[in-house]
Amino acid sequence: MARLLIYDAYENKVYTYANLNENNPMPYSTGTTLRVREFRGKSASPTLWTTIAAMEAWTLTRRKYGKGIPVGYAFRRIWEGGHGTRSQHYAGVSFDVGQSLTRTARTAIYNAARGTGAWGYVEPLSQTPTWVHMDRRYGTPACSGTTAGYPTLRRGSRGCYVMILQDALSTLGYQTGSRIDGIFGARTEEALKGFQRRTSLRVDGVCGCNSWKKISTAVIGVGRTKTTID
């Protein structure tokens, strides 16, 4: 069973789906084209998250391609690792697919994904020779000179990047609350200030480029700790 958080950027709200069966379809996806277990992949997390926009992009791509798309990797928590320090997989908006398919089939999926215009980024096939990468990143990256990474967050922010921040801070021992909720409130701000203070960053309660770099580097792949929340 899984608890699923879905961020609605259109309304700036976070919706919670409790006790989803692993064979249930992902909310906002078409039919059974993407089940919870496929989105989860190898993650052992009881709590998952994504966005409505990512599910809409998946649905459009699946419809355009016209047949099943095997998912190799989708959701991961940042402390589980397996991807780069600022991977969109940790936000639940990234898919690596088609690993078991032929090059021709992967090219067709790539063209379908590009053709929808719904993804934030579809990686060139020259960089993904045995899979197709597509993600629905959103927001302006906190670090300049790149289209990758996470946006600046502060009190009042909402969404999947706040979920990454809460996940990372709690795992590092800075408590943001009893559960991950994707809402940057007073406790998340104080937890961030605590991390900033201890790591000699500017203590302003704003998660910008430097804070993201230090937090990501400190937490990636460390595994679940006794202070990790779900």
Language-model features, listed with the residues they occupy:
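A short, mixed-charge helix-start or loop-turn motif at secondary-structure junctions
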Residues: 39-43, 151, 177
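Catalytic cores and adjacent binding grooves of peptidoglycan-active enzymes
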Residues: 4-7, 85-93, 99-172, 178, ...
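Cell-envelope/glycan interface and biosynthesis
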Residues: 3-128, 132-136
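C-terminal extensions
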Residues: 220-230
